Curated annotation (Swiss-Prot):
Superkingdom classification of source: Bacteria
Protein name from the UniProt record: Large ribosomal subunit protein uL24
Free-text function comment from the UniProt entry: One of two assembly initiator proteins, it binds directly to the 5'-end of the 23S rRNA, where it nucleates assembly of the 50S subunit. One of the proteins that surrounds the polypeptide exit tunnel on the outside of the subunit.
Organism whose genome encodes this protein: Variovorax paradoxus (strain S110)
Keywords (A to Z) from UniProt: Ribonucleoprotein, Ribosomal protein, RNA-binding, rRNA-binding
GO terms assigned for molecular function: rRNA binding; structural constituent of ribosome
Stored NCBIfam families: rplX_bact
Amino acid sequence: MNKIRKGDQVIVLAGRDKGKRGTVSLRKDDSHLVVEGVNIVKKHAKPNPLKGTTGGIVEKTMPIHQSNVAIFNAATGKADRVGIKITQGADGKRVAVRVFKSSGDEIKFA
């Protein structure tokens, strides 16, 4: 189970965007994710008339490693860690849910 999922509010812990908050929009693989408004780089693009693209400088959001972000706890207003708690579901099966380590509150889906 991934501790940080698409739609979670995260805060950047390290790098040039330290302290910025954003929403996870995409998981690239097991260790990298794309956060909206964070790690924006400028790419120089050539014009391609076959694809109908114009050349110039394009801003693009690049992936960031998941170790450099932490989930944002709205109740405390700070970064928090994620834990996994096993509970009994309605049908009697075991269900794993994500919880905040500081308070033990369940993390709701976005």
